Amino acid sequence: MRLGNAYAYCKPSQNVGLKLDLLRGLPGYVGHATSRINRLENQDNYSIKMMRSWPNAYGSALNCSVFDGHGEKGAQLSQLLADKLCSSLDFPEPSWDKQDLKKLVQEYARRFPEGNYWKHKLSTFEKFYNKFIKNCNSKQELLLMKEGDSAILGQNGGRMIFDKMGNIIDKIALLTELDRLRLFYGFARFDLDQCCGLGTAAGSTASSIFLYPYDDPNAPIDEGKDDDSWIISHSGLLKLIVTQVGDSKIILCDQDGIAHALTTTHHINSSRERHRLSIDPSRLDPDAFGETRFLNNFANTRSFGDVAGKPYGISSEPDIFSFLVGNTLHLPRSERSKLPFNGDECFLALVTDGITNKLADQEVVDLITSTVNSWGLKKATPQFVAEETIKFIQAIATKHSDNATCVVVRLSNWGNWPNVDRTGPQRETKLMNAQSNETKLN
């Protein structure tokens, strides 16, 4: 089975506005919904695409992304990203190398000479490249894991995971230097060439997943493997690559129904971001609403566009995380605990801050699982639960609530979580408060 090449996206000005080739090929496996909520315009966008030239034995990867635009031309920029960003990465082998990335940093330094960010990055390029691209091992990529989990890592940061035949599945890291270079260079190049031309009135976040089967890179490629059937019936482990720019979120639901945030938000209150931007926290003052903004203007410290902040460090350099997830049928029981989430995960949810500003991560997961538990697997597909998530946000929204977008990707253990709703009372309280406030206004 081979799915269509088209990606799916939603334009805010349309009710549905979808190219459906891909989604018709994935009934019940990818859900998607978006709404402007109470804003005049929906500046959110999303894309769902099969990448045909991703470097793996199957030759394809499922890419899903959400984009949250801001500024006068925010919708235009998020649409541009949905249309073209990940497509620009879809080729077998990058033709660029380390020196090309250095030249790109030089271009940024020439284009944005006002601040010191790009000059400093250029002067420390070797250190930056070695830390984040060349020698970025699994431990670095899995920085979201708790410190106690570091025991599962082998020497040099590698997970020593073995299959039932005793073969090493993941010896060092899931991503090569070339893989990381593809993402770093590709994002920065696209931002400079495509996004910065929109001027100061546009910016956007970008949160993406790239999902594909784990296979021995030295194994021969069978013709029969060059299809997309693994999305529906793959019985082994999957590589999950996550990239993050901004403050949208990617949440994973494990086999126990527990939420795991796979991304960190790029805000000025993050010590990691303050270090990157060389900012003294004592010089930061919250505004009248209690929010602290970078340069007294920007909610996010990383984004596409936002030209006014580019000289001072607002960049599209992505955080990159890699994980092994999926079906553990071929793993000995003793090896499953070495996986970051113990395998047999249930689903992924990609959501913009119009959702995460209203619901905690566990509430998002529980809203989805409880919807499936209530309606049943036949009715409550990923498409159904994505729409129900947006309906819930609409129900609890206030006058100034932000746009909301939700993409749900079904994984191997869909529907097999415990029948437990850990945050039902919290969601019910939010719903009752919203209804009470609406009654008072009327």
Curated annotation (Swiss-Prot):
Cofactor requirements of the protein: Mg(2+); Mn(2+)
Q: Which residues form the PPM-type phosphatase domain?
A: 35-411
What the entry lists under CDD domains is as follows:
PP2Cc
The record's GO CC annotations read: mitochondrial intermembrane space; mitochondrial matrix; mitochondrion
| Transit peptide, residues from-to | 1-34
Q: What is its main location?
A: mitochondrion
Organism superkingdom: Eukaryota
Residue ranges of the TM segments: none
Q: What happens when the gene is disrupted?
A: Confers rapamycin-sensitivity.
Q: Where in the cell is it found?
A: Mitochondrion intermembrane space; Mitochondrion matrix
* The EC number(s) this enzyme carries: 3.1.3.16, 3.1.3.43
Pfam family of the protein (one): PP2C
SMART domains according to UniProt: PP2Cc (SM00332)
The record's catalysed reaction(s) read: O-phospho-L-seryl-[pyruvate dehydrogenase E1 alpha subunit] + H2O = L-seryl-[pyruvate dehydrogenase E1 alpha subunit] + phosphate; O-phospho-L-seryl-[protein] + H2O = L-seryl-[protein] + phosphate; O-phospho-L-threonyl-[protein] + H2O = L-threonyl-[protein] + phosphate
Q: Which UniProt keywords apply?
A: Autophagy, Hydrolase, Magnesium, Manganese, Mitochondrion, Protein phosphatase, Transit peptide
**GO terms, molecular function:** [pyruvate dehydrogenase (acetyl-transferring)]-phosphatase activity; protein serine/threonine phosphatase activity
Q: Which InterPro entries match?
A: PP2C, PPM-type-like_dom_sf, PPM-type_phosphatase-like_dom
Q: How is this protein organized at the quaternary level?
A: Interacts with PRO2.
Q: What this chain does, per the record?
A: Protein phosphatase that shows typical type 2C protein phosphatase (PP2C) activity. Catalyzes the dephosphorylation and concomitant reactivation of the E1 alpha subunit (PDA1) of the pyruvate dehydrogenase complex. Required for efficient mitophagy in stationary phase cells.
Miscellaneous = Present with 432 molecules/cell in log phase SD medium.
> What name does UniProt use for this protein?
[Pyruvate dehydrogenase [acetyl-transferring]]-phosphatase 2, mitochondrial
